[in-house]
């Protein structure tokens, strides 16, 4: 039916949702989540959601982390930003300033002398803020647990959301911890935090 067709009134074709240009079929037609979205798009032509769900989705997909590397775990933390693991493909990118960060990754041995600096940096982060404790030393003191100068876990100074075990944990483990944090943000939301 073209514009010059005089057979009747012009009727717009029924939308079929998001179409994959390669296959010509709806995206994720086997996935129940995408099937629900495609059906809603086909029915109404637009999506309806709550503001909190939209904010939570946007916040979990664009997290900025600040590195607080104190020891050897920091090397593995840097690996997650390198091309092999590329944390930016998951919507997580490093930032140098705590005022622009959503996540602080504490990696390494936290000493008593460094603890006030950790708390000060944490307080400079905007709400909602999250902390990932990376490695045995940050989780509970690790190898230096019985030393007089070591804090036995950074959770004594700042509230920790995700613990990544290992000495040092691999970059895959940290990436998994970041993905768990994204899942936690989607589950709990950010407004009531």
Swiss-Prot record:
Binds 1 [4Fe-4S] cluster. One of its GO terms (biological process) is electron transport coupled proton transport. Its main location: membrane. It is an enzyme of class 7 (translocase). Its cofactor is [4Fe-4S] cluster. Keywords: 4Fe-4S, Cell inner membrane, Cell membrane, Iron, Iron-sulfur, Membrane, Metal-binding, NAD, Quinone, Translocase, Transport, Ubiquinone. Signal peptide: none annotated. The keyword NADP does not apply. [4Fe-4S] cluster binds at residues 72-73, 137, 167. InterPro entries: NADH_UbQ_OxRdtase-like_20kDa, NADH_UQ_OxRdtase_20Kd_su. GO terms for molecular function: 4 iron, 4 sulfur cluster binding; iron ion binding; NADH dehydrogenase (ubiquinone) activity; NADH:ubiquinone reductase (non-electrogenic) activity; quinone binding. It is a peripheral membrane protein. It is found in: Cell inner membrane. It catalyses: a quinone + NADH + 5 H(+)(in) = a quinol + NAD(+) + 4 H(+)(out). SUPFAM superfamilies: HydA/Nqo6-like (SSF56770). Residues 1-25 are annotated as: Disordered. Its EC number is 7.1.1.-. NDH-1 shuttles electrons from NADH, via FMN and iron-sulfur (Fe-S) centers, to quinones in the respiratory chain. Couples the redox reaction to proton translocation (for every two electrons transferred, four hydrogen ions are translocated across the cytoplasmic membrane), and thus conserves the redox energy in a proton gradient. PANTHER family: NADH DEHYDROGENASE (PTHR11995), NADH DEHYDROGENASE [UBIQUINONE] IRON-SULFUR PROTEIN 7, MITOCHONDRIAL (PTHR11995:SF14). Belongs to the complex I 20 kDa subunit family. NDH-1 is composed of 14 different subunits. Subunits NuoB, C, D, E, F, and G constitute the peripheral sector of the complex. This is NADH-quinone oxidoreductase subunit B. The gene is nuoB.
